[in-house]
């Protein structure tokens, strides 16, 4: 049979740790005995993390290669449901593994001859993480509130139509986003007004 690390491909040929192997094993089992077999066969993950959100709850973040993100999102709803059953109700989120390139300064400009693409900037990566996080719901608006002590709070407006599906997870989303980017975020489902 396949080894437990068959579904995980780490950068620089590193070995997956125990938790990542567990996630990889769960994906393999799903591939073997579920109707997701055809879609899962081509897909792999790059990393997995378990973090604490909101006190005692734990969430699992699964990082996937950017080119495979679309394929994962096609089966994400069913995949998340199966994985959450396996890991006893821990929330599971899929996020693409993106790189942030440093801002070119006067000194560093000579090293990298190529211009830094927009998709590798900090802002673009953080926005993309947010979009991956709330999938299948859609972000319909964003407000950044700067408080008097110059701390920022990002208010993210999600699609009201998806409220029933994702409302119970918004605390997890906020915790995961804070852990990955260090930014505070609040999710809302506003009534639509013109």
Curated annotation (Swiss-Prot):
Question: Could you tell me which InterPro entries the record lists for this protein?
Answer: Ribosomal_eS7, Ribosomal_eS7_CS
Q: Where in the cell is it found?
A: Cytoplasm, Cytoskeleton, Microtubule organizing center, Centrosome; Cytoplasm; Nucleus
Major location category of this protein = cytoplasm
Q: State the UniProt keywords alphabetically.
A: Cytoplasm, Cytoskeleton, Nucleus, Ribonucleoprotein, Ribosomal protein
PROSITE patterns for this protein: RIBOSOMAL_S7E
Assembly with partners or alone: Component of the small ribosomal subunit.
Name the PANTHER family on file: 40S RIBOSOMAL PROTEIN S7 (PTHR11278), SMALL RIBOSOMAL SUBUNIT PROTEIN ES7 (PTHR11278:SF0)
The entry sums up its family as follows: Belongs to the eukaryotic ribosomal protein eS7 family.
What is the protein named? Small ribosomal subunit protein eS7
Q: Which organism is it from?
A: Ictalurus punctatus (Channel catfish)
